[in-house]
Amino acid sequence: MSQNIRAEIRARFLKVDTSNVADVLDDMGLLHQGLAADFRSFSGTSGKLAGFAYTIRGQSTPYGMGGDAEKMTACQGISEDEISVWSGDGDGTCYFGELIALGLKERGCVGALADGGVRDIAWLNQHDFPVFA
């Protein structure tokens, strides 16, 4: 699928209410497609997150000095208009913050969904980078 078509699909989803999308999916027999109630927005954006998923799977563990190179490497394949989906154990350990968001945004990423902790909320708000966790 071309990038233009992907961008058009994303734009169409951003124009409609989430509840309408959920109702249509239910009518199609695609039940339970919404986020669990545990997820909530961590940034002061419109509250909408739409795009194709780029899943990053792994364990979030504390790292030593020098940064989190493995996370940055995992992000290198993301494309424009995609959402980074951080799939892990959801134990509250920080998955996501300013440095990762900055690298993703430079690659055209439009937001993130993290099964774990998030930090640097003020930066995310200032740079209009929606994050749900």
Report residues per predicted region.
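Feature captures the catalytic cores and cofactor-binding loops of soluble hydro-lyases/lyases
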Residues: 1-133
